[in-house]
């Protein structure tokens, strides 16, 4: 049977001014939040609660199982990591991952960050002492609660579904990209690919003082989407073009990429494909786009990157 995409109509709420209207949950309401279009709440999105990490603290996560899932077939697993002050279900409605899953038959997991709707990653909160080295920071943050939750969810999904362990992917938006990037740098050996929108990492977390890279996991296929008008956090002490440049250089170094990419322009998506001896890197500059992710980005991630 030909794979299909299901486009559900929704009821627009054009008066909405909330970042994540709670009324969306379980309804057909759709909104446009700062240029980010939502989809109707997916009918098959499962909400789960439980203690799955050894510290005894409860977590919440959402699982999407498309009707096209075939239990006898090895199936990819996609982690969708929400932005700051968002939720797992919020990431599901502000992206098109569930629609891609309908077409392709893979499983989606959308976890909630454990605390305050913010992932436990360096660069989110400045709680490390100033004199602490990048090495000690990296070691301390290597196995946070959120990281342990991801590992626990992988094991849970492997028990419940016929998951292809060689096709586990992670994608994040903004703070979720911080989480995705940190996980890729520390535990990327279990990922087939990592992708993110906005949210480039601060350079002190990528490079030692001598310029060598900070990396525990080795190479991993990476996709970086950078909106042209992304902007910087309040009181940021760094340059946007510089941080984007060196976030790209970081993975070019780790993946041993060729310096000259193949270029393709699709509408407002300016795409650079870097071939790597160890893993590829895709860099996308999105013209006229501010901080956020386009609704079709999940399709780009899958069609150009994760599907291979």
What does each of the following model-derived ranges do?
Residues 158-160, 165-218:
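Primarily recognizes the serine-hydrolase "nucleophile elbow" in alpha/beta-hydrolase
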Residues 40, 46-48, 52-62, 73-165, ...:
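Serine-hydrolase catalytic machinery in alpha/beta-hydrolase-like enzymes
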Residues 267-270, 287-292:
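Histidine-bearing beta->alpha loop at or near hydrolase active sites
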Residues 192-278:
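The feature captures the conserved acid-bearing segment of alpha/beta-hydrolase catalytic domains
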Residues 87-90, 117-121, 203-206, 231-235, ...:
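Extracytoplasmic/secreted cell-surface and envelope-processing proteins
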Residues 79-81, 197, 286:
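Alpha/beta-hydrolase
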Residues 1-77, 103, 142, 146, ...:
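A domain-start/cap signature at the N-terminus of enzymes
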Residues 296-308:
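Catalytic active-site module of serine/aspartate enzymes centered on a nucleophile-bearing elbow/loop
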């Amino acid at each position: 049977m030909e794979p299909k995409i299901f486009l559900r109509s929704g009821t627009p709420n054009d008066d909405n001014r909330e970042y994540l209207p709670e009324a969306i949950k379980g309804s057909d309401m759709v909104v446009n939040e700062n240029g980010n279009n939502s989809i109707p709440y997916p009918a098959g999105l499962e909400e789960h609660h439980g203690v799955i990490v050894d510290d005894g603290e409860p977590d919440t996560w959402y699982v999407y199982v498309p009707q096209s899932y075939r239990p006898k077939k090895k199936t990819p697993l996609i982690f969708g990591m929400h932005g700051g002050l968002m939720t797992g279900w919020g990431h599901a409605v502000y992206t098109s991952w569930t629609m891609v899953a309908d077409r392709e038959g893979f499983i989606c997991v959308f976890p909630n960050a454990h605390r305050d709707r913010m992932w436990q990653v360096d660069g989110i909160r400045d709680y490390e002492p100033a004199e602490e080295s990048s090495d000690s920071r990296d070691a301390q943050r290597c196995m946070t609660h959120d990281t342990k939750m991801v590992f626990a969810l992988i094991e849970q999904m492997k028990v419940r579904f016929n998951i292809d362990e060689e096709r586990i992917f992670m994608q994040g938006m903004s703070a979720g990209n911080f989480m995705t990037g940190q996980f890729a740098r520390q535990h990327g050996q279990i990922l087939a690919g990592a992708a993110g929108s906005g949210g480039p990492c601060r350079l002190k977390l990528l490079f030692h003082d001598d310029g060598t890279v900070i990396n525990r996991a080795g190479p991993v296929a990476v996709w970086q989407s950078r909106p042209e008008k992304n902007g910087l956090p309040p009181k940021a002490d760094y340059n946007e073009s510089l941080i984007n440049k060196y976030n790209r250089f970081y993975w070019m170094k780790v993946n041993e990429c060729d310096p000259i990419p193949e270029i393709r322009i699709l509408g407002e998506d300016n795409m650079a494909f870097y071939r790597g001896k160890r893993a590829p890197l895709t860099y996308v500059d999105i013209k006229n786009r501010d901080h956020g992710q386009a609704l079709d980005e999940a399709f780009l991630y899958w069609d150009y990157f994760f599907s291979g």
